[in-house]
Design a protein with these regions (language model features):
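Short acidic, glycine/serine/threonine-rich loops at helix termini
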Residues: 28, 32, 67-71, 78-81, ...
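Acidic low-complexity segments
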Residues: 109-122, 130-139, 143-146, 153
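Gly-rich Lys/Arg/Thr-decorated short loops/hinges at beta-loop-alpha junctions or inter-strand turns
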Residues: 65-76, 107, 111, 115-118, ...
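Alpha-helix capping and helix-loop boundary segments enriched in small/acidic/polar residues
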Residues: 76-83, 115, 135-142, 188-194, ...
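Intein/HINT protein-splicing elements and their conserved insertion hotspots or analogous self-processing inserts
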Residues: 1-32, 134, 196, 202-241, ...
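N-terminal glycine-rich phosphate/pyrophosphate-binding loops that anchor nucleotide-derived ligands
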Residues: 2-101, 148-164, 168-173, 177, ...
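Acidic, glycine-rich active-site loops and adjacent beta-strand->loop/helix elements
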Residues: 70-74, 109-117, 125, 166-172, ...
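Phosphate/diphosphate-binding loops
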Residues: 143-201, 289-368
Length: 368
């Protein structure tokens, strides 16, 4: 297992793979699903325990499908409250889009320290004292205003309405609670789901990849400097519009957004949940910077990107529609394979090979 494989597998099977997080009782999700099913039979089409990007609910008494996603973005708001609140909102919106829906409404909740208390905003925010000379000292109220503005600016860009929210100043922790819920209306005939459907399907990426959002690489010692994910407002809207245009072809077989651990996590999850494999050419990925490395292309969490899967015969039609929306960057970067592993290459060189089902020994290595 090389360093890149270890970093990606740690993200997949430790950071993102909540099934092995004993702090979460998944029986609660099952009970909630059962309660919804008893109250509104057959209304819950995709539940919160379905290993997908969002839940899908058939509104009783209508043919309207509602897509919902709740997401927290707490710790990142300590050093960068504006950008992190905005990317949290944008990420939840992408999750709704990934199910084949157009985001419409957002509700938020912010829990923080009392308004008048001072907080450190910047790299030393978690320490409570600045030693780098780059932080700002501000009141909790000022930090709240930055977080609210980040959410509001993303909503304005995406034409999503903020319809309500909650607020508390009873939190004593340095880390604020920043939670958003996004509601959307299904625009595809049926919910699009994350699992890969067929070997041979092509993988299309929408949006460009940069070097920001490199937390996973930084923790693995693969880069020297951490670069937080940057809120890309205009690009986020362009990616959404391009994705919705692709949906109009009725040729999209699977869809997912790119969040934590980037292309690596998105491709590995779609393949594993579909019981298939994948092969990806990282050199084919559209990039924002010229000197980006293969591992940065693979794992960085650049915002405003989506992943689609289509049959080979439909690639040209789908790409043409995507690119018709403000000339959005899009490319075929790989294909689904009839395999049990995901292979990432760069100019013919294997960068990482990730098994769908790591052995206990491999999982144990991730903690070392």
């Amino acid at each position: 297992m090389n360093k890149i494989e270890k970093a990606l597998m740690h993200a997949l099977f430790v950071h993102l793979h909540h099934n092995i997080d004993k702090a979460i009782d998944f029986s609660i999700f099952k009970k909630l699903n059962q309660k919804v099913g008893q109250t509104w039979p057959a209304a819950l089409l995709v539940g919160p325990d379905a290993n997908d990007d969002a839940a899908v609910f058939n509104m009783p008494g209508s043919d309207c499908l509602v897509v919902a996603k709740m997401e927290s973005h707490c710790s990142p708001c300590v050093p960068r409250p504006y950008d992190s609140a905005a990317t949290g909102a944008g990420g939840a919106m992408r999750d709704v889009v990934a199910m084949g829906a157009r985001p419409i409404f957002l509700l938020d909740f912010i829990g923080t320290r009392p308004m008048e208390q001072e907080v450190i905003v910047g790299p030393c925010g978690f320490d409570g004292k600045c030693t780098c000379g780059k932080c700002q000292v501000m009141t909790s109220q000022d930090r709240i205003n930055l977080m609210l503005k980040g959410i509001a600016d993303m909503c304005e860009t995406m034409e999503v309405f903020v319809v309500g929210g909650g607020f508390s100043t009873s939190f004593s922790d340095i880390v604020p609670a920043v939670v958003v819920s996004v509601i959307g209306k299904q625009v595809t005939d049926q919910p699009l789901t994350k699992p890969a459907k067929s070997a041979g399907d092509k993988i299309i990426i929408i949006g460009e990849t940069g070097t920001d959002g490199n937390d996973t690489l930084y923790r693995a010692g693969l880069v020297d400097t951490m670069q937080p994910a940057i809120a890309l407002f205009k690009e986020e809207r362009m990616a959404m519009d391009a994705t919705l245009a692709a949906f109009a072809t009725n040729k999209i077989k699977a869809c997912s957004d790119l969040g934590a651990a980037g292309i690596g996590a998105a491709v590995c999850e779609t393949a594993r949940f579909g019981g298939l494999g994948a092969k990806v050419d990282l050199a084919a990925v559209p990039v924002r910077v010229a000197d980006i490395t293969p591992e940065e292309i693979l794992i960085c969490e650049t915002q405003a990107r989506m992943l689609l899967q289509v049959e080979p015969a439909d690639v040209d039609e789908v790409l043409a529609l995507i690119r018709s929306k403000n000339d959005v960057a899009a490319a075929v970067i790989g294909e689904i394979t009839n395999d049990d592993q995901i292979v990432f290459e760069y100019n013919g060189e294997k960068i990482a090979v990730i098994p769908n089902h790591p052995s206990p020994e491999e999982i144990q290595q991730l903690g070392n």
